[in-house]
Amino acid sequence: MTPQRRSKITPERELELYEAALDLLRESGYEALTMEGVAARSRCGKSTLYRQWGTKPQLVAAALRGTRCVKLADVDTGSLAGDLRAAACAAVEGAGRDTALMHALSHAAFQNPELLCALRENLIEPEVAAINAMVERAVARGEIAPDNPAAEFVAAQLMGVMRARQMVEGRQADEAYLHRFLEAAVFPALGLRATSRVASHP
């Protein structure tokens, strides 16, 4: 569980602490990162960091989430196709800013159960919930059938393809690639009409 905060810091100060933590991650990697180092870099008391986040994994996960420009929970375009395209744009924007950092953290997470748990709690689960909410809104609007068997796999498909292309092809899943994936694989399974012609790209 995420530790309960016992004191308040301003959003501006919180962002400074997040940026300090991420800067140190980029410079030295996860294993070398310490709460003491973040405190020194941000000129903050170490006790404040522990009081706010409790552990290094929780701070790292919160920093990644807190510095994202677009949160999927805020996406609501009025249609499922629009929501999923916006989600794809947000995912590409977030991944593109710190590809090397995310790869390093992914590797560290599978060796550190506490970090993996924190990343799931702070990053993955909220995004899965947001995508599921998009699907639920689509059901309520009558865009897709409530018993459509593909509905439960939308989050896994969209999040999984981001990682899969890098592993299979050695290339990032950019916005154009994700849009083609949505049009060719996700929308047809959901019974949504593709809105653009899917072309073959290298």
How would you describe each model-predicted region?
Residues 1-4, 82, 86, 93, ...:
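C-terminal peripheral helix-coil segments that are non-catalytic and often amphipathic
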Residues 1-43, 58:
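Basic, helix-initiating cap at the start of DNA-binding domains
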Residues 43-53:
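Short hydrophobic/aromatic patch on the recognition helix
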Residues 52-54, 119, 123, 163-164, ...:
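Tryptophan-centric aromatic hotspots in well-structured domains and transmembrane helices
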Residues 58-67:
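Alpha-helical DNA-contacting segments of helix-turn-helix folds
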Residues 72-101:
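Hydrophobic alpha-helical connector segments
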Residues 104, 114-141:
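Amphipathic alpha-helical packing segments from all-alpha helical-bundle domains
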Residues 118-123, 140-156, 175:
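All-alpha amphipathic helical-bundle segments outside canonical DNA-binding/catalytic cores
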